[in-house]
A protein has these predicted regions:
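Conserved pre-ATP/AMP-binding loop-to-beta segment of ANL
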Residues: 69-71, 194-197, 207-238, 245, ...
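Gly/Ser/Thr-rich phosphate-binding loop
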Residues: 300, 328-331, 341-408, 422, ...
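Conserved AMP-binding/adenylation subdomain of ANL enzymes
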Residues: 257-275, 285-329, 342-348
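Conserved ATP/PPi-binding loop(s) of AMP-dependent carboxylate-activating enzymes
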Residues: 416-420, 431-466, 505, 602-603
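Structural core segment of the AMP-binding/adenylate-forming
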Residues: 128, 132-215, 326, 333-334
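AMP-binding/adenylate-forming catalytic core of the ANL superfamily
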Residues: 140-165, 180, 323, 330, ...
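Conserved AMP-binding/adenylate-forming core of the ANL superfamily
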Residues: 55, 73-128, 145-150, 209-215, ...
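AMP-binding/adenylate-forming catalytic domain of the ANL superfamily
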Residues: 192, 196-198, 532, 564-589, ...
Length: 625
């Protein structure tokens, strides 16, 4: 039996012993003696008698251990042509002072703080400063519109907001301050203060409740880390639900630190002193786990990149960053590689840079098509490793465990379940399916450390949405199968969440925006395949009777409304006006059927359809793109 199989078996059969062993890699103020707390199923908790501080583990212990001069964070901004490297000592000192500044504004253990910032080092400093105080951060992606920000403010009820004056895109500057101000006109909760990082590209005019970052830091005194219970929340990260208010995924402090530390070694084969680059955004879970926390927890150097794969300035941007930073590995989404491949199909830009330190390319966030995998492998000459996880899980469910036992790559597969994740493929009745049969991907409870213990202030919704479909299992919402070798193939979402360039977005929320237009009687939004972004949202709208409006005008208004309400991240550009939508006799729109037709499948007509003739009218529209 190989290293992977023995480790996986131990993680399932001797769960407590396995994770208490893993917990020894962390410095605890109170070392846990218990692994799993199963006193309140299905709400399981990890390390219930442990206490720690995540920021201490990410910074202070490395300084105390004699590695204070090692680079901790390399910031590379292609959009401002700026760079900055922070040593572990410098980053620790900045975080300790900013935490002191937050404390002077009344932030205490357990308080929530919303962070609305682009890819600047101050975003990581703000996250770690919250962790140092035992406060709970909730980072909101800087591309989200006022309505999305407002919903998160009302759910998290933050003591204060930390923002930047702007984000910088290749062709424009996105001002954040007007978005924050507009969001606060929509909320019932009003945070006391807003700390604003002024960026040279576009400083913001500040009202009375604003305080400049530099002003706060000028008088700030450093504070020591505050120990918290392992089961206390470290952060809340909101994810797209299919309906209703946003879901606040909770990450607890102890399980998070243990699981991320384990993953860096077992999954990514990255260790103290290595340079690691995750090309994502701190507003997403990948940025939380693998830009901010995991690399610092193990004493690696984390690269933080503000820019794009192409256009800042060219398709060689990623290879320049790898060459200049000495990154051993890159973790990004397939969308980024598809964008580079489209502009530089022959890989000429790759040849311009010294990539001798580069060992592995990791991909996740959406399906990695075999064509993109093959192109990257052939042009870069390194293993290209697909893996799969979710906002909810916080770290990989299935991967090629490079630090345990590197396995053969099978294009289209995320390889095998990571130790701790007991993955099953279930039929609609909950029976386990044999190899080769596709079904719902579920995970046997309890979930391992680092995954969500619940949703913010909503145990009931957590149980209803994730744990109620199959008794004793967490439902991932993805479908797939395993082959005879145990490799997992993830085939896509089984709900109405789509994946645009690695970003999970709710089609239901987009439909709500379209339906609000006075000319629209009903609508549907589906995800359709896109060569560059993986999926794109496609809108279908039926007009109200008697409405007289120019179709192009309506299209422009609907696209603008989605951009305004959801944000540019929705990449919503495609909407058709149609005579009707296919429905069941009970009135449910047949979105799965629409998706199948749009993807060119010979979709069977459901027996429950009310009017099969509607599909005949829609086929040419759906297949025209």
């Amino acid at each position: 039996m190989g290293a992977y199989h023995s480790e996986f078996r131990r993680s399932i059969e001797s769960r407590d012993e396995f994770w208490l062993d893993a917990a020894r890699a962390i410095d605890w103020s109170t070392m846990p003696t218990r692994g799993l707390d199963d006193s309140n199923p299905p709400l399981y908790r990890w390390f219930p008698d442990g206490e720690l501080n995540t920021a201490f583990n990410a910074l202070d212990r490395h300084v105390d251990g004699g590695r204070g001069d090692q680079p901790a964070l390399i910031w590379d901004s292609a959009v401002t042509d700026a760079k900055r490297t922070y040593s572990y000592r410098e980053l620790r000192d900045e975080v300790a002072r900013f935490a002191g500044g937050l404390a002077s504004l009344g932030v205490e253990k357990g308080d929530r703080v919303i962070i609305y910032m682009p890819m600047v080092p101050e975003a990581v400093i703000a996250m770690l400063a919250c962790a140092r105080l035992g406060a709970v951060h909730s980072v909101v992606f800087g591309g989200f519109a006022p309505r999305e920000l407002a919903a998160r403010i009302d759910d998290a009820r933050p003591t204060l907001i930390i923002a930047a004056s702007c984000g910088i895109e290749p062709t424009r500057i996105v001002e954040y301050q007007p978005i924050v101000d507009q969001a606060l006109t929509m909320t019932t909760h009003q945070p006391g203060r807003i700390v604003m990082l002024q960026r040279d590209a576009k400083p913001a005019p500040l009202g009375p409740r604003y305080l400049e970052w530099a002003e706060l830091m000028a008088d700030a005194k450093p504070v020591d880390p505050v120990p918290v219970k392992a089961t206390d929340p470290l952060y809340i990260l909101y994810t797209s639900g299919t309906t209703g208010r946003p879901k606040g995924v909770v990450r607890d402090a102890g399980g998070h630190a243990v699981a991320l530390t384990y993953s860096m070694n077992a999954v990514y084969d990255i260790h103290s002193g290595d340079v690691w680059w995750t090309a994502s955004d701190v507003g997403w879970v990948v940025g939380h786990s693998y830009i901010c926390y995991a690399p610092l927890l193990i004493g690696a150097t984390s690269v933080m990149y503000e820019g794009k794969p192409v256009g800042t300035p060219d398709a060689g941007a990623f290879w320049r960053v790898i060459a200049e930073s000495g990154a051993r590995a890159l973790f990004t989404a397939p969308t980024a590689l598809r964008a580079i491949k489209r502009v530089d199909p022959d890989g000429k830009e790759i040849a311009k840079y010294d990539l001798s330190a580069f060992r592995t390319l990791f991909m996740a966030g959406e399906r990695l098509d075999p064509d993109t995998l093959g192109w990257a492998r052939d042009k870069l000459g390194v293993p290209v490793i697909d893996h799969w996880w979710q906002t909810e899980t916080g770290w990989p469910i299935a991967a090629n465990p490079r630090g345990l036992e590197p396995m053969t790559v099978k294009p289209g597969s995320a390889t095998v379940p990571v130790p701790g994740w007991d993955v099953r493929i279930l039929d609609p009745e909950g029976a386990e399916l044999p190899p080769g049969r596709q079904g719902a991907i579920a995970i046997t409870l309890p979930l391992p450390p680092g995954s969500l213990p619940t949703l913010w202030n909503d145990d009931q919704r957590y149980v209803a949405e994730y744990l109620s479909r199959y008794d004793g299992y967490y439902l991932t919402g993805d479908g797939g199968y395993r082959d005879e070798d145990g490799y997992l193939y993830v085939m896509g979402r089984t709900d109405d969440v789509i994946n645009v360039a690695g970003h999970r977005l709710s089609t239901g929320e987009m439909e709500a925006v379209l339906a609000a237009h006075p000319a629209v009687a009903e609508c549907a939004v589906i995800g359709v395949p896109d060569e560059l972004k993986g999926q794109l949202a496609r809108g279908l709208v039926v007009l109200k009777a008697g409405v007289d409006i120019d179709e192009e005008t309506l299209r422009a208004e609907l696209v603008d409304a989605v951009r305004r309400e959801i944000g540019p991240v929705a990449a919503f550009r495609d909407v058709d006006i149609v005579a009707g939508l296919p429905k069941t006799r009970s009135g449910k729109i047949l979105r799965k059927t629409l998706r199948g037709i749009a993807e060119g499948r010979d979709e069977p007509v459901p027996s429950t359809i009310e009017d099969p003739g509607v599909l005949d009218q829609l086929r040419p529209v759906l297949q025209a793109h």
